Amino acid sequence: MTRIEAVRYRPILDSRGNKTVEAEVTTDDGGFGRAAAPSGASTGEHEAVELPVGEAIAAGRERIAPRLEGREFAGDQRGVDAALHAADDTTDFSAVGANVAVATSMAAAKAAADVLGVHTYQHLGGALRGRNFPVPLGNVLGGGAHAADATAIQEFLVAATGAPSVRQAVFANAAVHQRVKDRLDDDGVPAAKGDEGAWAPSIDDATAFDVVAGAAAEVADEFGFDVRLGLDLAAAERYDGDEYVFGDDRRSTAAQIEYVAGLVSEYDLAYVEDPLDENDFEAFAELTDRVGDETLVCGDDLFVTNTERLQRGIDAGAANSILVKPNQIGTLTDAVDAIELATRNGYDAVVSHRSGETEDTTIAHLAVATDAPFIKTGAVGGERTAKLNELIRIADEA
């Protein structure tokens, strides 16, 4: 095994122009890994804590590096991540920051893969690696916390579930993204882009469904395979403690369940993320009972990549899939533990980016390593296509 020789940190910019943490890990036999932490806009209240970048880097240098340098082996991911927890000594990384922790964890994994002369997904995969590749979920139109004066629903997603290859799925999503813009232009609707590169027109949700469904149908006809729709409702952002407020519509929990169930039926949705409040396991269970045989009901803010919350959901029958974001929980080991728990209990695990991203491609490798059915990482934009292009390369070399 290869011992960690040096750990270095620096501030860099993410896709929103905000500072984030980049970590570099070097081993005593020349292995090298570099990784950067992403950052979310609509964050769950139960996520691990992200510290201001300067504080996180200082904590990394003072508390993390001394625990790793000369003491831990890069190839022992569980040992590295245990040392990160020991350096923090809280349950949510509030002492050192989940941003510096996850950057370090991912950089160590890359350094270990470098020493072994294998890809990161091969190093991480082990027994979890199957023969499939994840289908990209691409955000093509939206609003919510990602864009002002746009749709109330945060993300309108597309997934080329019928594509014969990762490459074709990626290209199909990009084509839908362009067709959405063409349709908006035809209707005289201007649209800038939101945080994740999706179009953010000032239209209501009903109009958005028409635009995206029409664009997806055109691309499906052109490419010759199914392109299905999905949603991230980010409902916790719309819940006022009594009702769900989406634009001019106010709905009780029962009405929200009916609304989402109706959307699943009307649009044949492949995926529905955070349709209800992040603390309402009972409502999630009711919706899952209604539509779980037809679509993935995915918990993001509900589970925050946390095994304790996931186990609570499993016990309640809440959702049937989990969104996995390593920075929500702080380490790759914790993320993989959540994936393993989900898989053992019949839940799918969908690996995801954040709205504030970098060119780091670790999540592409994590999705392949763990045989994820979907990877949610946008449709266009340099920090999004970095992951998508990496998926294409991995598929070509596999």
From Swiss-Prot:
Instruction: Write down the PROSITE patterns for this protein, in alphabetical order.
Output: ENOLASE (PS00164)
Where does this protein hold Mg(2+)? D232, E273, D300
Q: Which InterPro entries does this one have? A: Enolase, Enolase-like_C_sf, Enolase-like_N, Enolase_C, Enolase_CS, Enolase_N
Q: Which Gene3D superfamilies match?
A: Enolase-like C-terminal domain (3.20.20.120), Enolase-like, N-terminal domain (3.30.390.10)
Cofactor-binding details, from the entry: Binds a second Mg(2+) ion via substrate during catalysis.
Compartments where found? Cytoplasm; Secreted; Cell surface
Give the annotated active site: E196, K325
Pathway involvement of the protein, from the record: Carbohydrate degradation; glycolysis; pyruvate from D-glyceraldehyde 3-phosphate: step 4/5
Listed cofactors: Mg(2+)
An example GO BP is: glycolytic process
What domain of life does the native source organism fall in?
Archaea
Record SMART domains: Enolase_C, Enolase_N
> Which keywords does this Swiss-Prot/TrEMBL entry list?
Cytoplasm, Glycolysis, Lyase, Magnesium, Metal-binding, Secreted
Q: One Pfam match, by short name?
A: Enolase_N
Q: What is its EC number?
A: 4.2.1.11
**What is the uppermost EC class here?**
lyase
- Which GO CC annotations does the UniProt entry carry? cell surface; extracellular region; phosphopyruvate hydratase complex
Q: What catalytic activity does the UniProt entry give for this protein?
A: (2R)-2-phosphoglycerate = phosphoenolpyruvate + H2O
So where does (2R)-2-phosphoglycerate get bound?
Q154, K325, R354, S355, K376
Q: Which GO terms describe its molecular function?
A: magnesium ion binding; phosphopyruvate hydratase activity
PANTHER family of this UniProt entry?
ENOLASE (PTHR11902:SF1)
Family annotation (HAMAP family): Enolase
Q: What does this protein do?
A: Catalyzes the reversible conversion of 2-phosphoglycerate (2-PG) into phosphoenolpyruvate (PEP). It is essential for the degradation of carbohydrates via glycolysis.
Protein family membership: Belongs to the enolase family.
Which named protein is this?
Answer: Enolase
